[in-house]
Amino acid sequence: MSMEATELQDLSDDADYAASQQQGSASMMRSDSGKRSLQSEHEDAVLIYLKDNVAIHPTQFASERISGRLKLTKQDSVLFLSWIPYKGQTSNAKLSEKDRSLYTITAVPFTEVRSIRRHTPALGWQYVIVVLSSGLAFPPLYFYNGGVREFLAMVKQHVFLARSSEDQNVFIVNDFQSPLQRTLSSLELPSSLPVASGQSVYPLDGGSSSENQRRTSSDVGNRVSSVSQSGFRKQKSHDPTRDLSIHLLEKFSLVTKFARDTTTQLFSENNGFGSIDKRWNNQPVHSYPEKLSNIAEEKHHEIRHSYSENDLLKDDEISYIDVPADPLEFDKLSLMWGKPRQPPMGHKERRNDISPSIKCRISTEYFTALLDSEGRVVESKALRERVFYGGIEHQLRREVWPFLLGYYAYDSTYAEREYLRSVKRMEYATLKQQWQSISPEQAKRFTKYRERKGLIDKDVVRTDRAFEYYEGDDNLHVNSMRDILLTYSFYNFDLGYCQGMSDYLSPILFVMEDESESFWCFVALMERLGPNFNRDQNGMHTQLFALSKLVELLDSPLHNYFKENDCLNYFFCFRWILIQFKREFEYEKTMQLWEVMWTHYLSEHFHLYVCVAVLKRCRSKIMGEQMDFDTLLKFINELSGHIDLDSTVRDAEALCIEAGENGAASIPPGTPPSLPLDDGTLYPQEDDVL
Amino acid sequence: MPSRRRTLLKVIILGDSGVGKTSLMNQYVNKKFSNQYKATIGADFLTKEVQFEDRLFTLQIWDTAGQERFQSLGVAFYRGADCCVLVYDVNSMKSFENLNNWREEFLIQASPSDPENFPFVLIGNKVDVDDGNSRVVSEKKAKAWCASKGNIPYFETSAKVGTNVEEAFQCIAKDALKSGEEEELYLPDTIDVGTSNQQRSTGCEC
């Protein structure tokens, strides 16, 4: 870890580091896989094109620019793009060497370039924006001596370049499908460009749900128009006649500054990683370069953000209330950190021309590759990172969820897990026998049992019955759910049964498809979330309190608004937290969100950052309409089904990173789903009989 | 006194889990019944415009989670209530026995200015089930309880079929309105709610 920190420090200090060591910038612009080999492309690379005086603008002031040299090189028939800033030649003293190294582009292969957008105004400088297939985009590269056309012509000689049918200024590299256009169009800012209807937003979930994408793209036309009507009107000093380039520059400069501040902070604190939750110091931290690679992403992220918000609100009314600015200085801009999601783990192995059973096997094989010969998960953090950034292909969930939930130990072998399953199966049967052996006569004298069973019976028949797995009369899975919950209420008699538990169990049973396995996964989950259901509701109150602290930290005007309007109890988020958004998303999306949260990758309390992310997206609506507690509760409840999962998770990730140690410090120790602090009475008993 | 007219009437529905609180609310507001309502988590409300004489009101009907351990949330949801609807299932003795708890808990948490005269309405739901053959709480027993609590109006309903739901809520709305007006006038003692008007299905004469 310290080695890595040192390296990064070097990189940030030495502008030419990246240029001389391909390693630095290669990782800076690391693709999603993060595994791109660090080619030594200069050794026998052929120089194809060289252009001097190509600059980027880290601030909105044209005078502040970083000039450099743009190059195309070719090696092994792969074309590479590089842009290296000139050493010690900034146009303005305010720009540090660090600024320059931030933007260095070293040998990005065109296999990773999705498109190039050119901008060649009659007046002003020409520039291009290079968008990677990951969705990242580099800042605009300004051709101070002109020559964009030649540059593109040169590229075209070496890679397949097709002009987008939607925008003649967009050139798609190696394109096959429309998702590219989505990315490209998402680069445009609705406030400064008339966006044609029919254009679509960036793919929402890495292609895992094409249906959703289609729906999204078909909706966009409407949303775009409403965004341009209302969403940006509140922005001060907005002048629709301003050139896009200036607008882009502004955005980038803000982001740049933000990135700089954050990274400076990052390095100035202990071990260079101070702003990341210390409790997670055994996990990989987002490396400095990796973060930077996200800078350019804010374009599409912001626009999607706007769409989503507008989509949520559906209301084109212009708010006349002056909503205080977001304290995170750049509001939405700061929310650009979240990395784009990958396809679910195991997704690449999915093919449509093979039977489900083979699909399942292949998915399993993919997972198996992460295990050593005896079945241990070699690098649990790598697994958790992979899941965090893309979820799990459904067939694979059954293998992975028990690890995430803590039922299986990561370092257990195949044999140990097999043994565990058989032991646990017997144990489950014994527990189940405890209530099954209660005779009707005994039950008459066992009020607690009768009432508990009655409550469970009532709830299982109204849990996800519209979902295929549980639908229909005399559904066996509903019976299994009942048996598991009743058994659990004997396993953990003090906690018993509480409404909301069936919401948790339902997807677990659907995934595990085995009563005993589902039971033990549920037990593992309740080890962390049991306090949500305590009689004293303490677990809930702690989380709501932590949420209020996080909002105070990450959005003080919104916090103050809640304070003034007597909303600080955050009860309007009760359902979100109690069952971790189960009622807010459709079934599949809920499972995706859960597995992401269960990784505890950035924080054990990622769900709280998800809450902040959603609230933040709605802040202008909430404050603009001056919602009182009742209206707010209703509004939040009605968000159900209208929250975009992918962008929300990315926002949450951004917020979590941004909050850093301060965020972690806002969350009291022992707050669920942290494991309980002590082994005392976990579930305090009061007079409640159930 | 047009300026002091209340336009929002807040009603809270309480009762054990599964007695049909959500169904009653939806039947009244949306004239719909579904077998697929999920257990209510937290709280939610629906609104409905109601008219009395020439005045229009918004009835805000709060539906809450029925499990006892969520009662501590009531503090946030009950405040400012104008009427409390207690619901039990005529086929469940337990849900009837718990009415006292619900009533007391409400009075503690909502802490209305005049708890003695705060308007409650009792609803015995699910009278349609098994054509009444599985019924365990008699009408007589329910009315006796109502009488003991200051003559609470009582209705027997079927949220599924829609029986008596409209009537019950009209009474609820009237009670809420009266309660709201009392509060405004700061004359809680001048209104006598204690007169006997608890006849089943006839609505309340308040």
UniProtKB/Swiss-Prot annotation, chain B:
Q: List the S-geranylgeranyl cysteine lipid attachment residues.
A: C204, C206
Query: Mutating Q67L: effect?
Result: Constitutively active form (GTP-bound form); targets almost exclusively to tonoplast
Sites of Cysteine methyl ester modification: C206
Q: Which UniProt keywords apply?
A: Endosome, GTP-binding, Lipoprotein, Membrane, Methylation, Nucleotide-binding, Prenylation, Protein transport, Transport, Vacuole
Compartments, record wording: Endosome membrane; Vacuole membrane; Prevacuolar compartment membrane
The membrane topology noted for this protein in its Swiss-Prot or TrEMBL record is: Lipid-anchor
What residues bind GTP, as annotated?
15-23, 63-67, 125-128, 158-159
Choose any GO biological process term that the UniProt entry carries and state it.
vacuole organization
Disulphide-bridged cysteine pairs: none
* Keyword Transport set for record: yes
Short motif Effector region, span: 37-45
Query: MF terms per GO, please?
Result: GTP binding; GTPase activity
Q: Which domain of life is it from?
A: Eukaryota
Q: Key word Lipoprotein present in the record?
A: yes
**Single GO cellular component term:** Golgi apparatus
Family assignment? Belongs to the small GTPase superfamily. Rab family.
Quaternary assembly: Interacts with VPS35A.
Provide the function of this protein.
Essential for trafficking from prevacuolar compartments to vacuoles. Involved in the trafficking of newly synthesized protein to vacuoles. Essential for plant growth. Participates in the recruitment of the core retromer components to the endosomal membrane by interacting with VPS35A.
| Protein known as | Ras-related protein RABG3f
List the source organism.
Answer: Arabidopsis thaliana
Gene this chain is encoded by: RABG3F
